[in-house]
Amino acid sequence: MRYPRELKDGAAYHVTSEINRNEMELQSPQIKTMFLTFVKRAKQKYPFQLLDFCIMDNHVHLVIKPENGESLPRIMQWIKGNFARYWNKAHGKKGGHLWGKRFFSKIIDDIRQLLRVLDYIDNNPKRAGLVKRAEDWEFGGLYHHLRGRMDVVTIPRAAMPELCFPSAG
């Protein structure tokens, strides 16, 4: 049975999406870079803030805050659908499923939870043994933040609590 997705106006979400059968289809740096390109394009089409991300070999994590009443499912459908079409074409596939089951999303309820989610996402490559330090993972939001690369992640870390929870400050 498919459960309804929990959605809330103004909320930030921790989103996870896995590759079908846990395959390592996002392994190459070029593919990871192209996924980021589709996220950037989605930001031009739909109003949302990307607070953090981590692209692993078989799944992605995103922290997304839709704006102006935009729909999280619509944003994710666009990113995943367009990236899958690109991936299939690049790999000579006529179709098939790149992504596994539907994406998982959880509303981030407070500042402490936001900080836990950021820590979890940022340290995912370190826990997987891909880097010694979380900040060295080129396909993660922390790497971009620390190097001033604000083309994908556009909100400085210090501003995130106020953006997500304006009444908490």
What are these language model-derived features?
Residues 1-56, 65-169:
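Short Pro-Cys-Gly-centered "Cys-loop" motif that presents a nucleophilic cysteine in a tight turn
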